Amino acid sequence: MGKKSAEKTELVIVTGLSGAGKSRAVDALEDIGFFCVDNMPPKLIPTFVKLIFNSNEKRDRVAIVADIRLGDSFSDIFGVLDELKEDEINYKILFIDADNDVIMRRYQETRRKHPLADEFNTPSILEAIQKEREILLPARLQADYIVDTSNVTSSQFKERIAKLFLDNASSSLKIYSISFGFK
């Protein structure tokens, strides 16, 4: 793989608790120019990254979401991260977290089922959240950034993500004006 491509591309692995705000994080990353892929099986990440690096299309910023929805294959993420390090591919891990009460409230508001509810026969959302915390603990410990969404608004969360991943040079306001005439 071309080392220059790997050095130029910013790779972010997004993970965290279900209901904590990973989808909003992806939206925020897309808004600041990231190419985002959600729910990618970890074993596909090295191949995908190599394709991105060797592509003719310019992809300077890539974010990949890998989380518990992948079931047992999520545990492959740690071997994959080691493989990326061996290939000298730099990446950052963004872990999205929230308090149990906040996540429970979000699930009750959306009336969605927690991804682990069926897998572990947990009738309680709280039990599913606690089990997910156990499973994700190694990822949280390796995270470069941990963002807690418990007490922030959507716009504050988006701002935090932007501050983490925008450098001073690119944080200035850019205005593009495009016009055309038709006769």
Which positions does each model-derived feature cover?
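Conserved glycine(s) of the Walker
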Residues: G21
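Post-Walker A alpha-helix
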Residues: A25-V26
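Hydrophobic anchor at the beta1->P-loop junction of P-loop NTPases
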Residues: V14
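Conserved nucleotide-sensing/catalytic segment adjacent to the nucleotide-binding pocket
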Residues: I32, C36-E83
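Switch/connector loops and helix/strand junctions flanking conserved nucleotide-binding motifs
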Residues: D72-F74, N100-Y107, L116, S155-Q156
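C-terminal accessory "lid"/substrate-recognition subdomains
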Residues: G2-K3, E127-K183
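The conserved Walker
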Residues: S18
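Conserved phosphate-donor/acceptor-positioning beta-strand/loop module used by diverse small-molecule
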Residues: D87-R111, V147-D148
